[in-house]
Amino acid sequence: TLYCHSNKLTFLPALFENLTIINCSNNQLNSLPTLPENLKILNCYNNNLTSLPSLPKNLTDLNCYNNNLTSLPTLSENLELLNCHNNQLTTLPSLPENLVILMCSNNNFSSLPSLSKKLRVLNCHSNKLTFLPILHERLELLYCNNNLLNYLPDLPEKLRIICFHDNPIYNIISSSNLNIIKQIIKKLNEARHLYFCLKFKKQLKYWLWELIRKPKIIQKYHPSYLFENLHEDSDLDIVLNSW
């Protein structure tokens, strides 16, 4: 394990081959050396990186947000968490089938690649997306606000949190989407807390706002807090159950 975060490092020397965890976040790094083959977790967020070296095949967690990345290398087939928000990315490489959490907000995407069937969290807000790919049945959290979406694809039945305000959405295409949204609203009186934003359905929005206090939602369940809850915790069940 190598922890060298929160210094003023501008470069890293050659790395030991047996490293499995590297945390070099909160530095002034412009590049990274070749990564060890056995590396599983790489935290390199809050640097000045413009690119990443080839990723090891065993990598499961990649937190590279708040950099100046313009592209990502081929992703490991074992990758479960990818947090690349707030970069200068215009495309994503093919996403691995094991990916569970994808956070790619605040980039310049006009589209996303096909999503993993295991994906449970998708945060793609503040991009230039005109459509979303197929959303698979395991998806539970969806943040796609502040894009250019005109419609929503079919929503998974397990979806518990959805936020899609600030999009030019004209209609919810399928009746199944309406049913799912109704179920989400119904669950507001249960133990789960939900953050749900609607701009194009005023009556529904006002009804929702009467059920739970708007300040509480915005303060505690705004998408920006999702990063804090998840970026260092790969066990999504623990995180979600703590809400």
Question: What residue spans do the PLM features occupy?
Answer:
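Conserved hydrophobic beta-strand positions in leucine-rich repeat
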Residues: 2-4, 22-24, 42-44, 62-64, ...
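Catalytic phosphate/metal-binding cores of nucleic-acid and nucleotide-processing enzymes, i.e., regions
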Residues: 3, 10, 169-171
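Intrinsically disordered, low-complexity tandem-repeat regions
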Residues: 6, 11, 16, 30, ...
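Canonical leucine-rich repeat
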Residues: 12-15, 32-35, 52-55, 72-75, ...
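Leucine-rich repeat
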Residues: 15-20, 35-40, 57-60, 76-80, ...
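Leucine-rich repeat domain C-terminal region
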Residues: 126, 141-150, 156-209
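Cullin-RING E3 adaptor/co-adaptor recruitment helices
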Residues: 181-243
